[in-house]
Every structure is written in C-alpha cells, then in structure tokens.
C-alpha cells in the first residue's frame, strides 16, 4: 500500500495529531541543520512531503464535507420550495371553500 492510501484510512483526528508531530520534527531538523548536526538532510524533504500529503488529504475531506453540506442545503431548499408550491396549489384549488367558511365564521361572530 502507498503512503497516501494508508493515510486516507486514518481518522481526521489522527491526521491532525500527525501534522503536529511532523511540524515539530521539521522544526527540530531545521535547528540541527543550522547547527551542522543533521547527518541526514534528506529527512527535511521527506518530512515536508509527508506533511503536504497529510494536509492535502485533510483539505480534500474538508471540501467533500462542504460539498455534502451544500447538496443537503440545496435539497432541503428544493424540498421546502416544493412543499410551499404544493400548499399554494392546495390553497388555490380550495379558495372558494375557504372563502365560504370564512364568511360563515364572520356571520356567526356578528350574531
């Protein structure tokens, strides 16, 4: 399995913890490099790439979540619009009945 596939199987919380850990390691590597103590400078690039991969996965998840929320809002809006339209059609169809019942109530209240 590739690294990205393995990372995609982890939860978002685990990935965030890994991001924090990798940022700390990257900071440590940079300090060691500045002091000439880093024996394996390729670790900086590896860590940066891994960090970028994780951040990309987290961003994808965030965008997918936002898309799902937008779809849900659109669906509920369409559903609400359909319900309102159905109610308006019902009112138009029964307008005469409603007016008669209103007139009866008004007559009853006058007596």
Curated annotation (Swiss-Prot):
The keyword Ribosomal protein applies. Residues 86-111 are annotated as: Unknown. Gene3D superfamilies: 1.10.287.310. One of its GO terms (cellular component) is cytosolic large ribosomal subunit. One of its GO terms (molecular function) is structural constituent of ribosome. Pfam families: Ribosomal_L29. InterPro entries: Ribosomal_protein_uL29, Ribosomal_uL29, Ribosomal_uL29_CS, Ribosomal_uL29_sf. CDD domains: Ribosomal_L29_HIP. Residues 1-85 are annotated as: Large ribosomal subunit protein uL29. Keywords: Ribonucleoprotein, Ribosomal protein. Belongs to the universal ribosomal protein uL29 family. This is Large ribosomal subunit protein uL29. The gene is rpmC.
